[in-house]
A protein has these predicted regions:
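Helix-loop junctions and terminal segments of transmembrane helices
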Residues: 1, 222-244, 256
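Hydrophobic transmembrane helix module of multi-pass membrane transport proteins
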Residues: 22-180
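Membrane-interface junctions at transmembrane-helix termini in multi-pass inner-membrane proteins
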Residues: 55-78, 298-328
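Membrane-proximal transmembrane or re-entrant/amphipathic helices at the cytosolic face
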Residues: 400-464
C-alpha cells in the first residue's frame, strides 16, 4: 500500500484539473458567486483564484509525506505558510490601498481585502516551493520504491473517494463549524450593535481590531502549536490499532508537552509585548487590538489543548466526536455573544469572551471522550505547569528590556528585535531548570539536537 501511494501520486496530479476549473470559475465568474450587495468582494475572490488551484497541489505533497509518517515537511511548510501569509497580507493590503483606493471608506476596505488575499496566495506558493524542494531531495528514494513495487493492488477511484468521504467528512465538518463560528460572531456583532444604535463606521473599526489585527497575530502561534497534534496523528493511530493503550497515552503526553513548550512562551510574549507588536504591524490601530492580546493571549493554550484532543479522537477513529463537540461549543458561543452584546457594553470584548468559552467547552467535552476511550489523564504538571512557570521570568525580562529600551530608542522594531532573542534564551534556561527534561524529551522539540548540546554544557542539567 505504501508503494501504491508512490504510483498514485502521478494519478492524483491529473485530478488537479478539477482545482484548475474551480480556480478559473472563481476568476472569471466571481460576479456570479458574490452576492449583489457585496460586489466590493469580487477583486478579493479573483485574486484568490490561483490559490485554490495551488492549494490542491500543496495538499498532495503534504498528504504524500504524511502517509509515510513523515510529518516534519508538513509541519515546517505550515509554519512557513502562516509567516508569509501574515507578512505579505500586511504589505499587499497597504500597497493596494495606496495604489488603487480613492480614499473613501468603501474603497479602502475593498482594496485592503484584495491585498490581504495576496498574502494567502503568497503563503501557499512559499509552502509549495518548500514541499517541492523536499520532494526533490527525496526523489531518488521515491523512484526506487516505485521500481520495487510488484505486489500492490490498484484501487478504483470510486473506492478511494468512498474512503475519503467516510474518513475526511467528519474532519471537514469539524473544521467548518470552527471557521463558521467567526462569520456568525461577526454578523451578530454588527447586527446587534447596529440595532442598539451603534454607528456603522465605528462598528467596522471595532470589528477590524478584533478580526483583522488581533486574530491575525494570534493565529501565528496557533499554527506553530498545531503542528504537534498534526504530526502525532499517524503514530497515535498506529499504536491504538495494535491495542497498545499505554504507548498511545505516552505519545499523547509527549505531544502535549511539545505543544505547550511552544504555546506557553508565545502566549506570555504576546501578552507582555502586545502594544509594541500591534503598533509595529498595524500603525493605524486604536490600541484595542493590544488590549485584546493582553487579555486573550492565554487562549493560545486553550486552542492548543483543543487541537490535540481533536487530533487524538480523529486518530483513534472517533472522528464524529470533534464534530459534535464543535457544534455544542458553537451553540454555547452564539448564546454567550447574543446575551453579552444585548445586556452589556462590552462591545468587541464579548467576542473575546465567547472565543475563550468556545475553546473551554471543546476541551472539556473532548477530555471526557479521551477518558472514556483511552482512560487518559492530562499531564498537568509536566505538560502545562512547567512551561507556564518557565514563561514567567521570560515575560519579565522581555518586558523590562523592551519597555526600558523604548525610553531611549523610540522604535518598536529595535526594541522587539533586541528583547525577543534575550527572552527566548531566558525561557530555555528557565525551562531546563524547572522541568529538568531528559535528552529524549529535548530531542522531540524542533531544534532538539542543538538544545541538547547547550544543555550538556550547563552544570544544573542532568540527562535523566
Amino acid at each position: 500500500r505504501d508503494c501504491l501511494l508512490s504510483r498514485g501520486l502521478g494519478d492524483v496530479y491529473k485530478r488537479q484539473v478539477i482545482g484548475g476549473v474551480v480556480g478559473l470559475f472563481c476568476l472569471f465568474g466571481a460576479g456570479l458567486i458574490i452576492p449583489q450587495n457585496q460586489k466590493d468582494a469580487i477583486p478579493a475572490l479573483q485574486i484568490l483564484a490561483p490559490t485554490i488551484f495551488l492549494s490542491g497541489i500543496l495538499g498532495v505533497f503534504r498528504g504524500y509525506f504524511q502517509a509515510y509518517r513523515n510529518m516534519m515537511p508538513t509541519s515546517i511548510s505550515q509554519i512557513i505558510e502562516q509567516v508569509f501569509n501574515a507578512a505579505v497580507s500586511l504589505l499587499a493590503a497597504w500597497g493596494f490601498i495606496n495604489a488603487f483606493s480613492d480614499g473613501t471608506e468603501n474603497s479602502i476596505a475593498k482594496w485592503g481585502a484584495a491585498g490581504s488575499t495576496v498574502g494567502t496566495g503568497a503563503g501557499v506558493v512559499t509552502a509549495l516551493a518548500f514541499m517541492l524542494l523536499v520532494y526533490g531531495v527525496n526523489r531518488r528514494k521515491i523512484l526506487h520504491r516505485v521500481e520495487k513495487d510488484h505486489r500492490h493492488q490498484e484501487e478504483s477511484y470510486k473506492e478511494i473517494f468512498r474512503v475519503i468521504i467516510l474518513v475526511v467528512s467528519p474532519i471537514i465538518l469539524s473544521a467548518f463549524v470552527y471557521n463558521v463560528n467567526a462569520y456568525i460572531n461577526g454578523y451578530l456583532f454588527s447586527d446587534i450593535l447596529g440595532r442598539r444604535g451603534g454607528d456603522a463606521a465605528q462598528i467596522g473599526i471595532l470589528y477590524a481590531e478584533y478580526a483583522t489585527y488581533f486574530m491575525t497575530i494570534i493565529n501565528i502561534p496557533l499554527t506553530l502549536s498545531s503542528t504537534a497534534p498534526t504530526s502525532m496523528i499517524p503514530e497515535v493511530s498506529a499504536l491504538y490499532a495494535t491495542g497498545d493503550i499505554e504507548a498511545t497515552r505516552e505519545c499523547i503526553d509527549q505531544t502535549v508537552q511539545l505543544s505547550m513548550v511552544v504555546s506557553a512562551p508565545c502566549a506570555m510574549g504576546l501578552a507582555v509585548l502586545a502594544q509594541p507588536i500591534v503598533f509595529l504591524l498595524y500603525g493605524n490601530s486604536t490600541g484595542l487590538a493590544a488590549n485584546l492580546l493582553i487579555l486573550g493571549s492565554f487562549s493560545i493554550l486553550l486552542n492548543g489543548m483543543s487541537n490535540i484532543s481533536n487530533g487524538v479522537l480523529q486518530a483513534i477513529g472517533q472522528q464524529r466526536i470533534p464534530v459534535i463537540t464543535a457544534a455544542i461549543a458553537l451553540v454555547v458561543d452564539i448564546v454567550v455573544v447574543v446575551v453579552l452584546l444585548f445586556t452589556t457594553n462590552l462591545g468587541v470584548y464579548a467576542l473575546l469572551i465567547a472565543m475563550v468559552i468556545y475553546s473551554v467547552v471543546v476541551c472539556v467535552l473532548n477530555d471526557r471522550a479521551m477518558k472514556k476511550y483511552l482512560q487518559y489523564k492530562n499531564p498537568w504538571k509536566e505538560g502545562y505547569l512547567y512551561p507556564i512557570l518557565a514563561s514567567v521570568p521570560m515575560g519579565i525580562v522581555a518586558g523590562c528590556i523592551c519597555y526600558g529600551l523604548n525610553i531611549f530608542v523610540k522604535s518598536n522594531f529595535i526594541c522587539l528585535i533586541v528583547s525577543i532573542p534575550v527572552a527566548a534564551v531566558v525561557y530555555l534556561f528557565a525551562y531546563l531548570i524547572i522541568s529538568k527534561p531528559s535528552e529524549s524529551q529535548l530531542r522531540r522539540i524542533p531544534g532538539g539536537s542543538y538544545l541538547i548540546r547547550i544543555a550538556e554544557k550547563l552544570p544544573f542539567w542532568q540527562n535523566n
